[in-house]
């Protein structure tokens, strides 16, 4: 035995990839070796000239140990900084059974509602929490963060408002990070932001206004009068409200506002150095068709039973494109589920107890300081006590004393210091903080504390009265409720999810473990830099790896979704061109096949979209591109292009595309949605891209979470790097200081970055290169096998696809009347989530198997589609009626096959169409959901409890 052969640092790659299947897969596609296969699939013209410059792989154990060492460099002080981020307690039953459970975090956005009823119910619970606390009848299923939500509220106010003005009022008490993001958005919408004292909001004419409730320094103001005066002028009013304070305070709707928004982080979601967290967004019913983001609605299924679905989806970017209400794609579904379940578990009395405890501790602390002669700035507050010492020296001394005792305070200005209380604050903290503020060791406080909120500010209505918030307060009940919901969903812990352009790959357990380590989860985004050395090292490691992979000169981690990455990349181009004196460049070329987020993003930046045709092979029409680039030469800003193409093909002309755009004065933005087909094979910067966004929740193993979180960092060439997003409160060490932000936190959803770090570290150079090759091989295997039954719409060199393929269902539809939707729903009966339906071509399925699926799983999926083809042919031959067959009736539930049966096909054909289905049957909990009924009768709050009964 050789010891060197018994240690295998590449062990993780063998868990991520199915090396034992290589020979069979290669033989099926007619190749002898992996090198030969790649050579016949990838154009030589794009191949990178050298190998990846990445470290060798580490084992799972060694990678975790190394990351633990990095994490230990973060300092966990008790955070009293506030500004929208607070320590909280994640109930352990929710931590283990939702956040750490692949049944929840590996699911995709619930487009296929019939196999997503569990998380749809959880998201409906979240919406109900937001509806109850804000007082509005409609709430969305989450936005990316509070700052983004505020910017979306501003845009929505302009869409729905009647005031003919381009001016928007911003309360001077809003969080600085919120104002930072609003400045970015306002510039390219052409809005003028007026930041002033809240009481002066009605001094001018504004199309909209935003107020902070509670203010950034802790004060709570009665906004009812000023809102009333603005409403009399027709101004649309938004209120950014602290979610925990709304447990006690009057709702924004009662104050007279039109929109409410904020962060739900305080409801059981760790701070995580800035995210991810679910923002809430609630509004008047009249605005529902203009709202950003997703809304979960109650509809009915084919049997008439209540069923949930995503409502009003025609607002979304993939349908409306440049006319969309926003470019949002990924939201924060997993975090919304955590926040909603926090309210379910604690119930109305539990959250009131927490809110009152926070307020009582802050009030007791303020009382003690006042009795000691210290100037507490605000008499009315919820959780934040701001003190003015009158001189800088004393403020410095107090701040340092608190730091020495392990407490982070907020420095408001030279003479003022603030302490923000929170769910984890304890009576011992009062003693420590009192000592830091006064220098005295003894602190006696009365058990009976008088609150600082005036009676006229307090809500009089009841909250969280729906039975779902009053039933699951014991751990056994909560555990079983979570399990019941999980069992209604099909996630990747059951079967592959082959969604094209979504890259649903393995989210390995070792990758997920570190996100709940306190060293990562308990860090405030604005903690002193000396306390975040571990995060800085993690970011530096990842920056080096991503630069090597992509060939870019700089990386910005701020964008907290793919759509935000797009926006940030195009924003850098716009800023660069303005700095060059070329602000007139406002034309954006976008291929016809592009992701819907592309035109929506371009429109948000004030760019005019010019569509470039594609040829019969699905590639960009070079002649049309050249003509349009030359036509708009003086105004050309950029092209937005996806590579490999959205049609799943390596376009051989990519270098020519980049050259033509550059020759005509434009920049090249590359959409990184398909980066999984590039790593180790090509570098986007080397073929001519100037900026690229990377979906860490696709290519780099962050799970999709049932609709978020995501991360969309951007890679930039040197000339664009100074124009990456900056931040008002944190040194990003990249962008120029004067560049405003795109997200509330400087490094986006930083606490999920360890997932990608672990993936990169455990795969190493060799593993990352192998992953791409396997992604190509699996896709071509699927395409080859399915081509025996279905046309493959687009292929490239040697009849090959890249990492995904498009199956054309239109001929079958013409012959039989069976639609792509029927086939998607029928796949549920076989235990599979459908591939991407009707994108980028109507009447098709786009399949992306990824590298981490075994041949056995691919064969099951292929067998399902082949059997479905035979079922369609039966309909076409008249053996089954067009109006009554297993496809149009799909999916079938357990209730269907145990009740009356009058169909021309058997129960077995309905639910056990192939032998493997019997081994691990997934039962959809509802029949096909009626989308039209749901949109015509929109209900986005929890239905009566009897609807939940089994």
Curated annotation (Swiss-Prot):
InterPro entries: GcvP, GDC-P_C, GDC-P_N, GDC_P, PyrdxlP-dep_Trfase, PyrdxlP-dep_Trfase_major, PyrdxlP-dep_Trfase_small
EC nos: 1.4.4.2
Signal peptide boundaries: none
Keyword Oxidoreductase: yes
EC main group: oxidoreductase
Keywords tagged on the record: Oxidoreductase, Pyridoxal phosphate
Pfam families: GcvP2_C (PF21478), GDC-P (PF02347)
Gene3D superfamilies: Aspartate Aminotransferase, domain 1, Type I PLP-dependent aspartate aminotransferase-like (Major domain)
Catalytic activity: N(6)-[(R)-lipoyl]-L-lysyl-[glycine-cleavage complex H protein] + glycine + H(+) = N(6)-[(R)-S(8)-aminomethyldihydrolipoyl]-L-lysyl-[glycine-cleavage complex H protein] + CO2
This protein's record includes keyword Oxidoreductase: yes
Required cofactor names: pyridoxal 5'-phosphate
Origin superkingdom: Bacteria
Modified-residue entries (N6-(pyridoxal phosphate)lysine), positions: 698
Gene Ontology CC entries for this record: cytosol; glycine cleavage complex
UniProt record, GO biological process: glycine decarboxylation via glycine cleavage system
UniProt family annotation: Belongs to the GcvP family.
Subunit text: The glycine cleavage system is composed of four proteins: P, T, L and H.
Function: The glycine cleavage system catalyzes the degradation of glycine. The P protein binds the alpha-amino group of glycine through its pyridoxal phosphate cofactor; CO(2) is released and the remaining methylamine moiety is then transferred to the lipoamide cofactor of the H protein.
UniProt xrefs under HAMAP family: GcvP
Protein name, entry field: Glycine dehydrogenase (decarboxylating)
Lineage: Bacteria, Pseudomonadati, Pseudomonadota, Betaproteobacteria, Neisseriales
Designated gene of the protein: gcvP
